[in-house]
Amino acid sequence: MKFFQEQIAIKETNILLKVDNPKFFKMAKNAVINERLNLENYILRNPIFLTSYSPLEVPDNAPKIVKLMAEAGFNADVGPMAAVAGTFSQLIVENLIENDCKNAISENGGDICLKCEMDTTVGLYAGNSSLSGNLGFKLKKEKMKNGYGICTSSGTVGHSVSFGNADSVTVFSKSAIIADAAATSIGNFAVGNAVDAMNNCLEKAETISKIDGVFVCMGEHAGKIGKIPQLIKTDKKEVLGNVFEMV
């Protein structure tokens, strides 16, 4: 199957989108614009939503994107903006599915939502760790039939706020929104030496609901908890923005 790829960059949102028909790019861009407008307008009236590191209650009449982010924040005990990248990825894929798109992968700064009718490998990007580019997660098409989230937080790579120093904390969930907030929360516990930091992350992961599994990478050390996709060896030196391939 042929896939088409396009970068959608609007202000802070920078999404790499792969779809099976280029007609979906315009739909996706419009979805980003509309959801950003909803979020920005809410933040103008409620600026604490942008800066809070703690979960926030939001009113019932808040925009859908705001309520989803707030829910994910409470689930992982972090501020709602911890889920922003995964939220955009998921809302785009959901929008495309509603418009009969059969295969869509949205990656927003390491936070991925994908719906594919074929097995797909997602490569591990973990900064300077020797595991980066040498491991991948093989997702079965059955797992992705209704969309699936794979989100990564790092204390050593990227511009997102993390209070820990993990090379990567990758969370797997049916919801990319839930996974994004969870990855941030778990990554905040990556303190101490590599082994202690990894164990701290895995212990925190046990307390978070609605996630399938977690993979933590700390230098030459790695650990997992819960159910994660099959780990396979790869020879792709992954970089941010190029983290998936079809198999």
UniProtKB/Swiss-Prot annotation:
SUPFAM superfamilies: ApbE-like (SSF143631)
NCBIfam families, per the entry: PRK04334.1-1 (NF003321)
Family according to the record: Belongs to the UPF0280 family.
Stated name of the protein: UPF0280 protein MmarC5_0355
